Curated annotation (Swiss-Prot), chains A, B:
GO-annotated biological processes: ascaroside biosynthetic process; fatty acid beta-oxidation using acyl-CoA oxidase
Compartmental location: Peroxisome
Chief location bin: other
Name the UniProt record assigns to this protein: Acyl-coenzyme A oxidase acox-1.2
Binding site for FAD: Y147, A148, Q149, T150, G155, S156, G189, R318, Q338, Q339, H340, R341, G409, E434
Positions of short motif Microbody targeting signal: 659-661
Effect caused by changing E432A: Increases ATP and FAD binding
Organism this protein belongs to: Caenorhabditis elegans
Annotated positions binding substrate: K283, I284, G285, Y286, R293, Y431, E432
Function according to Swiss-Prot or TrEMBL: Involved in the first step of peroxisomal beta-oxidation by catalyzing the desaturation of fatty acid-derived side chains of ascaroside pheromones, which regulates development and behavior. Specifically, shortens ascarosides with 5-carbon omega side chain (asc-omega-C5). Does not shorten indol-3-carbonyl(IC)-ascaroside with 7-carbon or 9-carbon side chains. Does not catalyze the desaturation of fatty acids or hydroxylated fatty acids.
Catalytic activity reported: asc-omegaC5-CoA + O2 = asc-omegaDeltaC5-CoA + H2O2
Residues carrying the site annotation Important for asc-omega-C5-CoA binding and thus substrate specificity: E299
InterPro entries linked to this entry: ACOX_C_alpha1 (IPR055060), Acyl-CoA_ox_N (IPR029320), Acyl-CoA_Oxase/DH_mid-dom_sf (IPR046373), Acyl-CoA_oxidase (IPR012258), Acyl-CoA_oxidase_C (IPR002655), AcylCo_DH-like_C (IPR036250), AcylCoA_DH/ox_N_sf (IPR037069), AcylCoA_DH/oxidase_NM_dom_sf (IPR009100)
A GO term from the CC aspect: peroxisome
Amino acid sequence: MANRSIRDGDNPELLEERRMATFDTDKMAAVIYGSEEFARRRREITDAVSKIPELADIKPYPFLTREEKVTEGTRKISILTKYLNQLIDRDNEEESLHLHREVIGYEGHPFALHDALFIPTLQSQASDEQQEKWLERARRREIIGCYAQTELGHGSNLRNLETTAVYDIASQEFVLHTPTTTALKWWPGALGKSCNYALVVAELIIKRNNYGPHFFMVQLRDEKTHIPLKGVTVGDIGPKMNFNAADNGYLGLNNLRVPRTNLLMRHCKVEADGTYVKPPHAKIGYSGMVKIRSQMAMEQGLFLAHALTIAARYSAVRRQGHLDDKQVEVKVLDYQTQQHRLFPSLARAYAFIFTGFETIHLYSQLLKDVDMGNTSGMADLHALTSGLKSVVAHETGEGIEQARMACGGHGYSMASYISVVYGIAIGGCTYEGENMVMLLQLARYLVKSVELIKAGKAKKLGPVASYLADKSDETDLTSLNGYVKMFENMARRQAWKATEKFLKLMESGESREVAWNKSAVELTRASRLHTRLFIIEAFMRRVSRIEDIPVKEVLTDLLHLHVNYELLDVATYALEFMSFTQLDYVRDQLYLYLEKIRPNAVSLVDSFQISDMQLRSVLGRRDGHVYENLFKWAKSSPLNNADVLPSVEKYLKPMMEKAKL
Amino acid sequence: MANRSIRDGDNPELLEERRMATFDTDKMAAVIYGSEEFARRRREITDAVSKIPELADIKPYPFLTREEKVTEGTRKISILTKYLNQLIDRDNEEESLHLHREVIGYEGHPFALHDALFIPTLQSQASDEQQEKWLERARRREIIGCYAQTELGHGSNLRNLETTAVYDIASQEFVLHTPTTTALKWWPGALGKSCNYALVVAELIIKRNNYGPHFFMVQLRDEKTHIPLKGVTVGDIGPKMNFNAADNGYLGLNNLRVPRTNLLMRHCKVEADGTYVKPPHAKIGYSGMVKIRSQMAMEQGLFLAHALTIAARYSAVRRQGHLDDKQVEVKVLDYQTQQHRLFPSLARAYAFIFTGFETIHLYSQLLKDVDMGNTSGMADLHALTSGLKSVVAHETGEGIEQARMACGGHGYSMASYISVVYGIAIGGCTYEGENMVMLLQLARYLVKSVELIKAGKAKKLGPVASYLADKSDETDLTSLNGYVKMFENMARRQAWKATEKFLKLMESGESREVAWNKSAVELTRASRLHTRLFIIEAFMRRVSRIEDIPVKEVLTDLLHLHVNYELLDVATYALEFMSFTQLDYVRDQLYLYLEKIRPNAVSLVDSFQISDMQLRSVLGRRDGHVYENLFKWAKSSPLNNADVLPSVEKYLKPMMEKAKL
């Protein structure tokens, strides 16, 4: 059997879909998740979790108040702590991520930053003695930590952080202080209520000299009572668009004193007498950010996959209207408009995941290079991941919302759960670097590259930018390589054009900053085209390496859909290099591949193997029994606990009675 | 003073902005709201409401649980009932809408459908005797009603509703029945918990003949106890993406009997012996839908205005990074990327509101014509509003999300409130006709129009479609009329092209339905272009009628921004009619007008005169005191009621203690 999701008793609508699969969904999962081994481990973890009743949701998440969500996240994390060694290899980040997604979902928990930033920062920034003191305790979860950097008044611009750590030579202490309301640390996950320690980023000041932002270990709460220490003002920043099981917090410090040895001193040092010893390499703190961004394409791809799983399955269950058959209504998945809403996003989900694998691989490669003293790849990867993060998070958000709307009215119900996935995914446009800022960081790299070429130094270009030095050729669209050439033409033209605009403005007398700002939108356009080119190439590279023929065939269809959709989407740029006849051809190809994908659509989403537990969606259930479960779900929702609501007794009944008089 | 929003003690950042206004914001408000009279009434209502303490929010809405939101909506509506006559002219729909938006906001209340559909349907569908029986009681709010049409298994396809009303001649009763789970009425606002009556849409069946959907008055709950009657299963459908103060409901009817006279019989009749008397005009029930859609452009424009008010004000308060001045950080509103995120949407907000006025006017004109027996304009307006509803709701959603992201991290906090506005507005892509279905309804009209032209009957075209018969001319972009011509060229070309594709597929042997489906995406493209053309023209018509020079000047700038942005957005189509040099000109114009709008940006959003109460946003406060109020808001959020959460006591403390052993 090719689709492995078939079970007895399934809705026949989905059975029919799954029987059309032309490939083995387990083999596709191995391609999606990078190895047969990890795809199998995912299934095993899902299976093991399903057998531990205390790890199940106490209620559907949408029925919980915010306080209940925080409690539920905390309950789950404390229970998971018991089972961790039994369920996963704790050193395997991917297994851990999958486990947490299954059990806790997307809405957050008190250990989010503890594992993702607190411990890694201790590992990379704390000296050996400091690690001895704190790292094991943190690993054993004796203490809970977070990472406190952004402030109420400042996000991405680290140079203007207001929190200070002034060194007091007499007592050999740092005095940490947030002098204004805008200096309050704001947003760090789990800072508000859960953590008792924080790594606080503050401007290091010695004898009135500012040495810039550094990390300080700060105890926030008493380890026994959990009550905030004197000088510490800490609390939750209030409800958010999503992540409401997490207690993102604020933190004010009122001349709080910590010992000199609480400055993380792996790379820099402050001696007892106040002598500052510089770190050997200025960019050493940089790579954590690049790491997280390099994982984002994969993560966002999975968010998109989540939403599409729900929408594609539901679209095969929902019938509405008629085509040829006047007796039986048609599955809404048979409408071209529905396919056009879902399938290009499906191609993107695959593309993003494959691109994510590549950047994660590039990142590990970079770490090895840096260890060997070679930091030349840093700028390339930083630029690449900045662009990817922006483009992928933006297109993921669009795709998720279209998936939700493709579910009609029921998509709007929390029973679809798609709006939660949207809320989480769209955060990616803002966190880890605001999208416009990120696109402009990539643009800086592109402009530098063009300037290198103009200076005759094209050989110094990073591998991702080398096409910028090529000549734009006429190309045909008879092969995938033709599409790549077309995207190269477009990305190259726009990078040069935006650079020229910027340079011309400077020549005309504008300052560098003003010229940059006046070219900014054109520069972001260049960054987007460059990034989309990279995604297409990564998709192609991955497909070319697949050995299983049926899997390769359907992914080749998806790739064709992708290149045609993408090209049409930016055809304004393409028309400098192709004719309207070619454009019509691209359109026809697009519609052709929508039809080609149709029979495999449900199997392509099944291949993501996102369990019902993780989907948390009535519409997206594997078994397709949507309607009876929507009714069940609704009946159990909290508002239905009473037939007559207290508010009806209190307000509506008296109002109606009074009107009768 | 030109900007009327200036008060003592405001944040100087906003004061500086407002002092740059080149026009009078009260005069602009009169243009936005159609008359000086209504703009003034809005301010008076806002002012009056602010003086009635019991109409204030008991807490910021984001701090309320769903149950508390329902209670709060109910409390407010019952208090408002007392004050209605004092605060507004009850016959004035606009005043009523404004009042409800101020006091209750966007998240719903138990009378949403009572006023908007229950009473109007009684007015248009109930006979005089029936009106006497129910209408006055409904108006006095002795009873609360809703309108129950969509079912769990069927939304827009009315022909396949499953609920039946079988006439029993012996007892002269209708037997109402929902035979399956999918037949449950699903979604009607206030049906779940608040209403005691419903107008139920059911298939009328007499002697096994199905006469199609009809309206039946059905009592759901006992008027005294509010307990559901026998045969009635009713409840809340659970939490939604938004509208969570509303109890959208489900309804099952188990062979419930109602008297023959509960069929609404203004236009059709069922005699005691089961004789069915047809309504005189088949489309008579149609116009309610057209009315609501004709108001949607205005409504969505105001949602967009709401989000932009928040984002523009906050962008003038938030400082981040540097341009020329290395000492003082720059307002983020000075970044071109930020302007590009906000100002084209600002132009659209104005455009949508102006377009809304036109369609509302066309609707009243239509009603007069229909009264005179002339229904010829019906199809035109139906097509127009179908397209408008789709394009405007889609672009509004995009614009609101961009506004939220323009606020960076704080945009993601519920303190911005933008995500609530998004949740409400984006519902407009689905309710009142799913967007794709709507675009295809307009497409049907466009195809018919092209077929008329091909048949030599161009004179029969509706006024909105007459341009389809013109020849495509070369045009220049030196005047606004040039842009209109360009949009006509594009919309015409695409309408013809999509029609040809459809006809060709039929010629090649496909059935009408299949040919239609295979052309569907191209047809929706035609509908979008046609609609965007109409919006541009409506914007131009409105600006041309303005007398106040300063107001006209700034709106002319906004109009120029609009046409350039819109043209660039669909340049793929435009390039068939213009050169790349012209395209570069359009880009330059776009950036030029972003700069031109900049000094008036805050004053342009101030002109919407959306009160702080209605904004419900800490970021968007009129006085600009954002940061201290964010802190205040956060401190008062429910999670901060205790320093140490119960979940910390119960789960985290034991976990940490155990780890120490």
